[in-house]
């Protein structure tokens, strides 16, 4: 549809002529307090400086307005929020499956994977699955889980350790130790 009306997106802060208050508490470019002034006077000061008058806290009495470059303000705000998102790490739970009869070579490969997960800051879920007659030898499964726990004691803290078998499997959860 050509020439349609563009809906202006609502800004989080009112600027310049959008401000409705008669009097405002004014803050200068450098953050200095300029006192309570009329809206007209505040707009004139902002225009003199060649920047915008931005309503910072509309619910205050009188509303707090600041003389600033609004475009630069938005840019800095989005930049800082992107930085915060970058610093946040989502912790995932990675799962490795063992069997009571897992051979030494396979055990070492799975152990290396567990070490990598824990070093990356993720939690590790170790599932020990029993099949058929293996159910009769649950102590072998416990030995495997204890061996994993002992091999990773420098890197991880046990969050949950199975006391009994759940269905046909035992589950242990490890969390990485906090770095000093």
Curated annotation (Swiss-Prot):
<dbReference type="InterPro" id="IPR019813">
    <property type="entry name" value="Translation_initiation_fac3_CS"/>
</dbReference>
<dbReference type="Pfam" id="PF05198">
    <property type="entry name" value="IF3_N"/>
</dbReference>
<comment type="subunit">
    <text>Monomer.</text>
</comment>
<keyword id="KW-0396">Initiation factor</keyword>
<dbReference type="GO" id="GO:0005829">
    <property type="term" value="C:cytosol"/>
</dbReference>
<dbReference type="GO" id="GO:0003743">
    <property type="term" value="F:translation initiation factor activity"/>
</dbReference>
<keyword id="KW-0963">Cytoplasm</keyword>
<dbReference type="GO" id="GO:0032790">
    <property type="term" value="P:ribosome disassembly"/>
</dbReference>
<dbReference type="InterPro" id="IPR036788">
    <property type="entry name" value="T_IF-3_C_sf"/>
</dbReference>
<dbReference type="InterPro" id="IPR019814">
    <property type="entry name" value="Translation_initiation_fac_3_N"/>
</dbReference>
<dbReference type="InterPro" id="IPR001288">
    <property type="entry name" value="Translation_initiation_fac_3"/>
</dbReference>
<dbReference type="GO" id="GO:0043022">
    <property type="term" value="F:ribosome binding"/>
</dbReference>
<dbReference type="InterPro" id="IPR036787">
    <property type="entry name" value="T_IF-3_N_sf"/>
</dbReference>
<keyword id="KW-0648">Protein biosynthesis</keyword>
<feature type="site" description="Important for 30S binding">
    <location>
        <position position="110"/>
    </location>
</feature>
<comment type="similarity">
    <text>Belongs to the IF-3 family.</text>
</comment>
<dbReference type="InterPro" id="IPR019815">
    <property type="entry name" value="Translation_initiation_fac_3_C"/>
</dbReference>
<protein>
    <recommendedName>
        <fullName>Translation initiation factor IF-3</fullName>
    </recommendedName>
</protein>
<comment type="function">
    <text>IF-3 binds to the 30S ribosomal subunit and shifts the equilibrium between 70S ribosomes and their 50S and 30S subunits in favor of the free subunits, thus enhancing the availability of 30S subunits on which protein synthesis initiation begins.</text>
</comment>
<dbReference type="Pfam" id="PF00707">
    <property type="entry name" value="IF3_C"/>
</dbReference>
<feature type="site" description="Important for 30S binding">
    <location>
        <position position="107"/>
    </location>
</feature>
């Amino acid at each position: 549809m050509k020439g349609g009306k563009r809906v202006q997106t609502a800004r989080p802060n009112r600027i310049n002529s959008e401000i409705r208050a008669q009097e405002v508490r004014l803050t200068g470019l450098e953050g200095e307090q300029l006192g309570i002034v009329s809206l007209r006077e505040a707009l004139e000061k902002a225009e003199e400086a060649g920047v915008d008058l931005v309503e910072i806290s509309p619910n205050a009495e009188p509303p707090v307005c600041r003389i600033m470059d609004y475009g630069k303000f938005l840019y800095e705000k989005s930049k800082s929020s992107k930085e915060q998102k970058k610093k946040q790490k989502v912790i995932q739970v990675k799962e490795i499956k063992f069997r009571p009869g897992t051979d030494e070579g396979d055990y070492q490969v799975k152990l290396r994977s567990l070490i990598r997960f824990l070093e990356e800051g993720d939690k590790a879920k170790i599932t020990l699955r029993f099949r058929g007659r293996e159910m009769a030898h649950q102590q072998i499964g416990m030995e495997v889980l204890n061996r994993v726990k002992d091999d990773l004691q420098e890197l991880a803290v046990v969050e949950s350790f199975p006391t009994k078998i759940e269905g046909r499997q035992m589950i242990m959860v490890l969390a990485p130790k906090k770095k000093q």
